[in-house]
Amino acid sequence: MSKKIEFIDLGLPSGRLWATENEEGYFTYDKAKEKFGEMLPKPEAFQELWKEGRWFWDVKNKGMIVVGPNNNTIFLPTLGYGGSEGFNNRYSYGYYCSSDFRKDISCPIVLNFNAEAVWPESNFHYSCGLSVRLCREV
């Protein structure tokens, strides 16, 4: 994490702050946990963002604009995921890594969305590269 991470207050009940940008690149669950540690969102952070935010599909930029209770916003691009054969679902789905892992099925828990729906606690393939948006507990 060589660049300075900027955070924004969305006015969420927890006081949690969200990074204004994604981390550059795609990360497997293990690499994300190793590199970002405590700043990797817990599933409850994604749940809060989903429940408390207003989500709007941005047709031009292909992603979700999330408006917090205080009207501040973040943009979550749909960057798909990195697999063994390159990138998949780019510009149609967003897959964001959380800090948690389901051992019973060997899958990280992710925030997943497309133009029609948001799944704040989805499961995803262990070895795939995911997007990362950091948050900070206050």
What are the residue ranges of the model-derived segments?
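Extracytoplasmic/periplasm-facing segments of secreted or lipoprotein envelope proteins
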Residues: D9-P13, L17
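C-terminal, surface-exposed recognition/capping segments
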Residues: M1-K4, R16-Y26, K35-V138
